[in-house]
């Protein structure tokens, strides 16, 4: 029986850059009559492929498996992540083996099959299945990975709880919808089929929520960029790799949240080259947010060819505050609701409140009422909660 434990141990004694080569060499020597396919492609999501019933897979005890245990909070509980594992696979009448291991932030898979054709066909089947989703979300945070939790969150995102002007909502929705439905118009007039939208304004007013709702509306793949750094690679190479992945996903959305803190001076030149360079970005809609427009380099904020549309997401105005408060309190039992006069007073007193502060105001009122349970007291509770939330400098 092959000693997989020794193979793994000896390979991991090498320099990190040599580990894939060493493992591939040892496995090839071990199975001279078979083919070894090596991949680091994040689309090779073998575990999910098997869970969906696309193949049968079971763990072999030839290798002492190393499984990391993670606590994901009360809601998700305990999760397990295989670090080193050897599996046997039955797929389309073929029997294969797969050695999965991890080196730093990268997953390494070695597929062992009877022929190169079978290994490649299996690899392509897994990758095609993984990427065959219009709503797939890919995150780059030093490596590319799927984010099923964010995919689920997008499906439940709506505009109902956003405290935004209706006209602003409509304009944002129109920009995204019209981009993905107007490819022929762009081509007819010789325009590059790419756009950039920048949302800016103080925190707590729904930029992130609006982004999720726009992604849900578009129903397109999304690449969420959470880092432009890789300790083993240059900024230029990392950014080129991100844009290369985005172009493979097109038509798609590329999201840079809090772009002012994401992009440093060392990143700027490479990022601008990818946005403006020779490689075409057809089918890519770039979405970015910032809390501090003044901190964003003017090369990004003031060049229409990079972010064509800028939308200010500021503190809600009186009509939006009144509409939000009325809508939320209507969901309460009758005895918990404030009067029309109470809503009107609260609308005036919450000038300068962010959307998040209004959300907190409603929650605070509910908690206070449940504690005291005095019918008809919500007008008074509203005033008290507003004072408690009011920024000190505004009092």
Regions found by a protein language model. Give the residues of each.
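Residues at alpha-helix boundaries and the short loops/turns that link adjacent helices
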Residues: 14-17, 249, 265, 352, ...
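Secondary-structure boundary motif
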Residues: 29, 128, 248, 277-280, ...
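AAA+ P-loop ATPase mechanoenzymes
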Residues: 1-181, 231
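C-terminal alpha-helical "lid" subdomain
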Residues: 303, 314-395
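Amphipathic alpha-helical interaction elements
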Residues: 111, 164, 276, 367-374
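Hydrophobic side chains in well-ordered alpha-helices
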Residues: 118-126, 210, 324, 361
